[in-house]
C-alpha cells in the first residue's frame, strides 16, 4: 500500500498532475479511466525529504534511479518502475498510458 506522499511523488514524476488539467490527457473508455503520462523522472538532492521517500520506493522495487552530472555536481534522478506503475494503477484505479 502506497502512502499519500509516495502517490504524490510518483504522479508528479509521471506528469500526471499536469495531465488532469490538460484536455485530451485523461479520458474514459469502456468504463475505465485512462490518463496519459508525458514523462517519467524526478530530480532531487541527497538529504532532501523527497530523496528518502524515493529511496524507500526503490527498495520496494517501485522505482529506479541514476545519477546525472551537471557542471561538476551530481544529482540523483528517479523514475517509476513498471511495477510502480502497476501498483499506482491498482491503488488509484486508473490506467496510465505513456506519451513520448
Which residues does each PLM region occupy?
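Short, amphipathic alpha-helical interaction segments positioned at domain boundaries
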Residues: 72-100
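Hydrophobic beta-strand residues in large extracellular and virion-surface proteins
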Residues: 10, 63, 78-80
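Short amphipathic alpha-helical interaction segments
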Residues: 43-60, 64-66, 75
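Surface-exposed polar/charged interaction patches
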Residues: 16, 20, 60, 91-94
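Short amphipathic alpha-helical interface segments
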Residues: 1-52
